[in-house]
Amino acid sequence: GFSTLYINARIFDVKSDFHKTVGEKMAVRNEKGEPYRETYGPEHFTVNCPSDTLWRDYLLDTAEFCVKAYGCDGIYLDQLASAEPFACYCAEHSHENIGEFNNGYVYVLRELLRRLRKHNPNAYIMTENCGDIYGSYTWGNLTWNGAEYDEYYNVFKYTFPEFVQVNMVNPRGWE
């Protein structure tokens, strides 16, 4: 067998003790300067900016630490290939323009794979859902469909048979 550790690569819980000091700084900002917010079940989050070095470096360092300290084989980056990218208008962030969201994650995946393989040459990255822009850096994807969706995972599997696809079925609702 092999072990995979979980990291949410996208959101920050607003109830966290660190949201006011760190989470607010990492948040993607809309054109009014407000952070993008999302709700999953009863919990509320801000969306982190993957093209800003603050979040990017924290994510990379945490994932590398997991492989180095715990000896796990891979890292699962939740939401990375699944959720909507946003333009970030935060002038304090390190990105050069507002549209670098996806490029930020490409950098994370490329750099993370390089770092992980220093510690374990067989290390791998998994993400939630399939993103062809990210696929050359991942070993596999956790895929799922809601009742209203057909995101064509069978077509993806047919087109890219070398990718591992874990199909999740989760019938429980938030109610």
Where on the chain are the PLM-derived regions?
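Active-site-proximal loop/short-helix segments
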Residues: Y76-I98
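Glycan-recognition surfaces
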Residues: D13-F45, C49-P50, N103-E175
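The substrate-binding groove and active-site-proximal loops of carbohydrate-active enzymes
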Residues: Y40-L60, G71, C90-Y105
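Carboxylate/His-rich catalytic cores and anion/metal-binding grooves
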Residues: F2-F18
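Conserved, mostly hydrophobic/aromatic
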Residues: L59, C66, D78, I125
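A structural motif corresponding to the C-terminal end of an alpha-helix
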Residues: G1-F2, F65-D73, E111-A123
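Hydrophobic faces of well-ordered beta-strands that scaffold small-molecule active sites
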Residues: S3-Y6, I75-L77, I125-T127
